[in-house]
A protein has these predicted regions:
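Glycine-rich phosphate-binding loop and adjacent beta-alpha segment
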Residues: 330-411, 447-458
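C-terminal capping/lid region of NAD(P)-dependent oxidoreductase domains
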Residues: 114, 406-421, 428-458
Length: 458
């Protein structure tokens, strides 16, 4: 048995972390298996090249065994010496937390790799303490499906509603189940009957559940391509938050240039998207947010309203043409009162009711009441927007709108704000931060990140 060694490989620009070879015992088929710990970045790059063996590589890491030095070349990423493909085979059977498992077996001159899947699971409804990161079986793409390695999955306030059993679309689900509302991933397996995609393609989908994972399967006919060169975390912010904003503006409200629009929660992910896209549509914008976020609201071209100290119902004489409200303070009554004659309230959430511990039935009654307000005098209207309901009614719109947003991102016209990129083991804490509020931008899960390392903001 060999002492643990830390080996620093070449990773080019990625500068991935250190490999750790914990044990090396190898030889013939009757010898113990090889145990090697390899970090996620190295694994994924190795996967793309199928870990081709190359004994001519200059990037060798050698250990002392009969004076020999042998190597595996993993796409010029790293080499762990001592593995002779002609006489030995190994299997990674013991790894520390946060490391991917590789099963390395003899297959001619090409080892076979099996990745490790980890997921964020809801074990019971309630607080973030009910979230657990667990090992899960590696999914296999079925007919009409692809398997993706998850590059990014947005963390939404909606996730906290699902966890607390307050989200109508998942009301029938019971723990345990996997969290994750949306996904940007790289295809690494094609199911039977899938055409138009190939290994390595980057794709996106809104899944509602199941995407806080290292790997997952997706229906190929639901996927939207992610343009080359687009940052995966930024792309993930578009799938729910920016799609909600885009469809609120152009599908639900059908806004017109010059309209006066109030955005509640203007500093949040959806609020920021509404301000940016609303500005591009030529709207006059006001953003309700905490006073500490006034500068951010101005940055997006809107007039800030400190909702803690200013009455937005009296802020604009005559009232607003459109109000977007994802908070639902007092059951949307004040937002409705802030409209002018003929104005439209577009509600799309009820975070205030959640914070006040309201029951789901109460919040559903708030939504139902919106549709009765159109009979009140004053010509004002109200409606509730659901991204899932609109996708169900108009599936072509979803792909069309997401492709348009991806094109804007690829062209540099929009710059979604990623507040922080987090690891699987930090998801529970991320839920607490989402519930506390005050974030300027989106938290995005990047499964390749390790807990405890310095996180990267966009």
């Amino acid at each position: 048995m060999w002492d643990q060694k830390q080996l620093l490989p070449h990773f080019g620009e990625t500068r991935a972390a250190i490999f750790a070879i914990k044990q090396i015992e190898y030889g013939g088929h009757d010898r113990p298996p090889l145990t090697i710990a390899v970090n996620a970045s190295a694994y994924h790059a190795a996967w793309r090249t199928r870990c081709e063996l190359d004994h001519s590589s200059s990037d060798r890491l050698q250990h002392r065994r009969n004076g020999r030095g042998e190597s595996i070349r993993q796409h010029a990423l790293a080499e762990a010496s001592g593995i002779d493909p002609h006489q030995s085979r190994g299997q990674v059977y013991k790894l520390r937390k946060n490391l991917h498992i590789l099963a390395v077996t003899k297959a001619g001159n090409r080892p076979v790799i099996e990745p490790r899947n980890r997921v964020v699971e809801v074990t019971c409804f309630g607080s973030p303490d009910g979230l657990r990161v667990v090992d899960a079986p590696l999914p296999t793409a079925g007919r009409g499906e692809v398997r993706v390695r998850v590059l990014a999955s947005g963390l939404e306030y909606t996730d906290t509603l699902i966890r607390r059993h307050l989200y109508p679309q998942t009301a029938s689900r019971r723990p345990p189940f996997i969290m994750g509302y949306d996904v940007v991933g790289e295809i690494d397996q094609l199911g039977h009957g899938v055409s138009g995609f190939q290994l390595g393609d980057r794709v996106a989908d809104m899944t509602v559940l199941g995407s806080n994972a290292v790997y997952r399967t997706l229906q190929a006919n639901q996927l939207t391509r992610v343009p080359a060169g687009v940052d995966a975390a930024e792309a993930a912010t578009l799938i729910l938050s920016w799609m909600t904003a885009y469809q609120l503006l152009h599908r639900a409200a059908r806004v017109q240039r010059g309209q006066r629009v109030l955005v509640h929660g203007a500093a949040g992910a959806v609020g920021q998207a509404l301000l940016v896209l609303g500005g591009m549509a030529g709207l006059q914008l006001w953003g309700a947010a905490r006073g500490t976020h006034a500068g951010l609201v101005r940055e997006f071209g809107a007039t800030p309203i400190d909702y803690q100290h200013e009455d937005f119902t009296r802020f604009l004489p005559g009232g607003f043409d459109v109000v977007f409200d994802g908070i639902g303070e007092d059951g949307y009554r004040r937002s409705f009162a802030a409209l002018n004659h003929g104005g439209l309230l577009c509600a799309y959430g009820y975070s205030a009711g959640v914070q006040d511990q309201q029951r789901m039935l109460t919040m559903l009654m708030w939504i139902a009441r919106l549709y009765l307000w159109k009979w009140l005098p004053g010509g004002r209207r109200a409606r509730f927007y659901s991204i899932n309901a609109m996708r169900l009614q108009h599936p072509a719109w979803f792909r069309e709108d997401l492709e348009r947003l991806f094109a804007l991102l690829a062209g540099g016209a929009i710059h979604p704000r990623v507040a922080e990129r987090i690891s699987l083991d930090e998801v529970a804490e991320a839920h607490r931060r989402l519930e506390a509020g005050g974030l300027e931008g989106k938290l995005v899960l990047c499964p390749d990140l390790f807990a405890g390392r310095d996180q990267r903001a966009a």
